[in-house]
Amino acid sequence: MKQYVRIGFVVFFLVQLIQGQDTYTPLKAKDSKIKIDGIIQKGEWEFSEKIELDYEVNPGNNISPKEKTAAYITYTDTHLYLAIHALSDPKKIRASVRSRDDFGLISDDFVLLRLDTYADGRNNYLLLANAFGSQLDARAINALTDEERYDISFNLEYETKGTIVEDGYQVEFKIPFSSIPFPNGINQEWHFNITRQAFRDGIPIDIRSQPFDRTDPCQVCQTTDKLILSELIIEKRTELLPYVSGGLGGKKYTADAAIVYDKIKPNAGLGMNLDLNKNSTLELTLNPDFSQVEADVTQIDINSSVALEYPERRPFFNRGTDIVQYSSGAFYSRSINNPLISTKFISQGKKERMYFLTALDQNSVYQIAGEDRSYLGSGEQSFVNVMRYQRLMNKNSRMGLFSSNRFYEKGGYGNLFGTDGWFLFSKNWRFTYELFFNINEEPVANWIESEDQILDRSVQLNGERFKGSAVYLQLYRNTAHWKSYFSLRDLSPNYQADVGFVVKNNRRWATLYHVYQNFPNKEGLQFFSFGTKADLNYTYQDYLKAISVDGIISLSTYFNTVINYTYDWDIFKNFLGRNYRNVGKSELLLDSNPSESISINLMMTFGKDLAYNEEVPEIGRDFSLFFMPGFQLNNKLKLSPSIRYARLTNLETKKNYYNGAITRFSVRYQFNNFFNARLISEYNTFTERFFIQPLIQWNPNPSTVFYIGGNQNSLSDYNRELYSLFRIDQTQFFLKFQYLIGI
């Protein structure tokens, strides 16, 4: 009997394996046959292959979904076409009209096409659209967390239309082959799959065209359905991206005076994208306008001893950056602050990838990492080189080289060289490494004012030469119920990355992470996990820096709510030569989307923390809060108020080291998928400054944009003379028109 059971199990496993990788060979259609209007017409998709989405992968584990979905895929010489019919009660469909890459789209009903055009799991290109055809695209890489895995700054050009119909909704995609990276050749074999997100009793349901293995740590490797395409026409892109812009600014020179305006400041620049072949692209930008359309969300840094990192929003620097992402902070594109000219070469072959970037930076950022503090200065002009090469040895291993150089105009340099690797030993085990060393000569400059010392080296920039190194090793294991990793980090006292982001060094750091996870798939408990993370940190001088143990709990429950709780217990901690014991605090995260109309994001910390920026740091009572509800009033209008609050109180005197808040309010009206108007205001009690930013934007594709707006804010210098919450002391108006021209 046992033999029959074993045979039956083997047969079942083989059937699942075969089902897990299907092959689709659609017939080639004619462009004139398909009209992208969001309505699937009879005869329109007669050349297509039909694909059923038969697997609910979350919260169910590869079970048959209640929601039925059919997809149709075909192609022409120059485009890939996809249509999806998602059956549903129209009244229960969640969707709003959104601008491109609005992250709120992931809370909608949507459909998603995953493409692994190199069929090797290096990355996936994700093309999403909701029921109104609003788009979000991203690139996914093999990473441990969603934050590291998805890059939503990545952009592809594609066309979508969506319509809500009597039995659900329909979405049609038209994707130019010229916008998709893939290997050379007119005949292609890609990997792909299709996903639909639906909602059942308020809970998001992940439905796919192929099964998903929760025990496999490589999510992008599980895009394995084959798509066979023949005799494509490979079009090389030659694109020009000119822009014109203008700004008018002014400010008060005394508290009770009128605003005095400067002269209008016109500007112009040019970008160029040139396909050398299907795998290689050369990009050039001359006098680029890298001003941000929307202000960064202000972070509270009053109790931070190091510089804070902000996300990259500039499209030129975002393209191709998945190949230069490092755990050791070796590359940070925002360190290239204000380039006058920059060039970039990207090549993606079947077995290798290359990335080469040059820039003439007019206002260089200079950052020094210390054992407990970082030091940041604004410098002068420098020339930057970044080179990255990666070799894909086989499906389960890849290795690479990296170098970056920054040469300062008036002397000094920073060179960084390194190697890295990624190895998959089995479905459950993965090993990664990063090794770097730097050679530096400081400029002689007054960019940083500090009398501090880093061992035998002064923080002041006086031409000193030094060398440093960094090592990062990680062993990772993932099964159906256990997720674990062990990592080692080694940063020497003089490790510095002049084109990177390194804020702490002089540490040898070991981390052990071990978590149990389960998917009960119950109405009140779809997922839960609990575990621990332990850290042990020594310096290069062999004295103990920190011992820390975290308790971690996570669960998904009613009302589409995810709750994460962490207790961070610093058993021992050394800061600026002083020892502290039993410093513990809690962190609570709550993310809830109970309906299409309401979303809630909450982060709260409470417990003990150090007053890091006091002359003599002491332990205080900490409380901080971030709360942001979202209100989707209709399909086009959204309100997003938020508050960030932070307080640290002396345990003995009960006096506050600091106590303040940043309140922010955003209202957006989306006329259609390309045109919106929004208003952002913010008041910061730490600096006692107020600003308001109105903006109108038209953005029909990732590169073409027109916007007009302004910034109005108060100046804290005048607060004592004339205090008013909504006072305007400084103002700026700006507009920009940038248009993509294909040649």
List each model region and its residues.
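A short local loop/turn or secondary-structure capping micro-motif enriched for an aromatic residue
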Residues: 44-46, 89-93, 135, 146-148, ...
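Exposed, low-structure sequence patches enriched in small/polar residues
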Residues: 338-340, 346, 414, 422-425, ...
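Contiguous, well-ordered alpha-helical segments that form the cores/surfaces of helical PPI scaffolds
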Residues: 388, 418-420
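Primarily recognizes Gram-negative and organellar outer-membrane beta-barrels
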Residues: 233-264, 314, 364-383, 388-391, ...
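Bacterial Sec-dependent N-terminal signal peptides
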Residues: 1-25
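Short beta-turn/strand-loop junction motif enriched in small, turn-promoting residues
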Residues: 176-180, 406-407, 517-519, 682
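Structural preference for beta-rich elements and adjacent junctions enriched in aromatics
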Residues: 20-391, 400, 411
